[in-house]
Swiss-Prot record:
Entry protein name: 4-hydroxy-tetrahydrodipicolinate synthase
Keyword Amino-acid biosynthesis: yes
Active site: residue positions: 133, 161
Record key words, sorted: Amino-acid biosynthesis, Cytoplasm, Diaminopimelate biosynthesis, Lyase, Lysine biosynthesis, Schiff base
Name of the coding gene: dapA
A GO MF term: 4-hydroxy-tetrahydrodipicolinate synthase activity
InterPro entries: Aldolase_TIM (IPR013785), DapA (IPR005263), DapA-like (IPR002220), Schiff_base-form_aldolases_AS (IPR020625), Schiff_base-form_aldolases_CS (IPR020624)
Entry GO terms, CC: cytosol
Disulfides per UniProt: none
Domain of life of the source: Bacteria
GO biological-process terms attached to the record: diaminopimelate biosynthetic process; lysine biosynthetic process via diaminopimelate
Amino acid sequence: MINGSIVALITPMNSDGTVDNKSLENLVEYHIAQGTDGIVAVGTTGESATLPAKEHIQVVQQTVSFAAGRIPIIGGNGANATAEAIELTKGLSSVGVEAMLGVTPYYNKPSPKGLVAHYKAVAQSTDIPQILYNVPGRTSVDMLPETVAELASVSNIIGVKEATGDLSRVSKLRSLCGDDFLLYSGDDATAREFLTLGGNGIISVANNIVPKAFKAMCDAALAGNTEEAIAVEKSMQSLFSALFCEANPIPVKWAAHQMGLISKGEIRLPLTELSSEFHGLLLEAMKNARIEV
């Protein structure tokens, strides 16, 4: 499966709110050229919460088409209604994704029992490998390692994206889930340490705009070259913070637009464009990360 540096890809939009397919193609080509190891299409950073199911599936399908087998695509299939998640999963099963990434159901705060039932139902609706996604800061539900371990016994549930930033979970997840279960960091600020503790890869927001540096950090960390990984990480530390000055993906879309990676920085309501008070902060962080704008 996919290890290393994976981008949680933004979904570029036109001024009228429709998906900008030309910019989407440019992003896919950019990441192939920069050496990114994989793309997550229409996850949280791809504004999955504001794309209706039909459009969601179309964007993933378009991303797969643009990639043309040159880089693996993971399709987001998360929803807070199990029936909707299954609808997305069935729709994505025929478009050519390598795997799917499903966030824990948000807002309705299911119990561990509910999480297990949800993910089992989704996994049973497809043969495509499934990756769990735990990000309690956005969903208000924390999927504990013990729950992940129970789900790891399902044949096509192959890994978890863990975005709590709690590094103690890496060893616990590895112990409970076994060596073959894939562990992905979903927190850029602690990602390098996550890898050195036994993680397999990073599904990153910052990777949208610093893919070459992120790839270098991942490769060094996975190879055990800790000093090299730390040196690369230092250049991006202020960026990791600045990209969350407002709700993701507001800052990263603004930054990508400043770099010319997408034609516009449009974002769908209820999110709005980056407040002007944060422009200087983000530009300074981009400069520190050696990003030219």
